[in-house]
Amino acid sequence: LENASDMVVYEMHHRDFSIHPSSKSRYPGKFLALTEPHNIWYLKTLGVNAVQILPSYDYFTVDESQPEKPQYNWGYDPLNYNVPEGSYSTDARTPEVRIREFKQMVQALHDAGIRVILDVVYNHCMNIDGSNFQLTYPDYYYRKTAPGQGASGDIGTTGGDYANASGCGNETASERPLMRRFMLESVRYWVEEYHIDGFRFDLMGIHDIETMNLIRKELDKIDPSITIYGEGWAAGSPAIDYNLCAMKAHTYRMPGIGAFADEMRDALRGPFSDDTQSAYLAGKAGHEESVKFGIVGGIAHNGVDMSKVNYSKAAWAAQPSQHVSYVSCHDDMSLVDRLRTSIPGISD
């Protein structure tokens, strides 16, 4: 890949992609479904050159010991970050199978010229009690808030609640040396052992800028073409200074790291907060500047009136390649369904 801006990324979930009988897969819902020629052919017909796979590490809610039982989750409930999810393997009870089949999947996609981007969720754990982090060093890996003192990043803060910028009951403390080291070693492991081509950071705004920049530098040592981007926001207020957070507004401070552009997304299809409202794609006026901001790639441009851009009143990208353009993802309706609900009388 000569330039990150040349990527056309298809977000997918292992089970969703091949579980339906119409997929005619020998391995429905499994890693190996992405080794089958007809499934790879389908991806190629879409014109994509990269797949962004929803969390593929070992997560909490699916019971791997009952493969015959219909179970489903996106995977944003991390358990063990550095091992593939067993329910996507053909034999979760045999440890090496999930490892081998994940590698077979990556190899097959690479052979077809398709890059593999892994969705990673280092910003929180499924549970605090019983988590590997908490068992190793209680209350070190998680931020807490102190009553009457606002947000606090102090190690071992007592009397406060666990901070919850993830909306899932906790948030990890990426700014602390051992958590930072864990993240650095984890991404390096996925690249060196499984040959992953990039990472999509869930709720990247919870992490600190310094850690994200160190991750970029660490991966550059291996392969500068490895892609890094993420959600430049959080589900709440992180318990560290906002100016330290890897938010979308701070993308220009993170060279080589991109952020999802919700300005252009909602300008094209309508606001995320109301599925019945349409926008530019329906011929609605008032969204032109937001669309133009997306076209120039989130950088400062004399042709864009930032006062009329939704969500952002200042450019946030230093390079257009940091601006991740999209119109739909797993968090909302597909574009087709979104247009159906927001444009009365629209036909297929």
Residue spans of the language-model regions?
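Basic K/R-rich, polyanion-interacting modules in nucleoproteins and related proteins
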Residues: 1-5
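A residue-level signal for beta-strand positions that form part of recognition/binding surfaces
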Residues: 6-9, 78, 225, 323-324
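Active-site-proximal beta-strand elements of phosphoester/diester hydrolases
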Residues: 9-14, 327
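Substrate-binding/active-site clefts of carbohydrate-active enzymes
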Residues: 13-37, 41-194, 204-223, 227
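Extracellular, beta-strand-rich glycan-interacting domains
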Residues: 197
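Conserved alpha/beta catalytic core and glycan-binding cleft of carbohydrate-active enzymes
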Residues: 216-218, 222-348
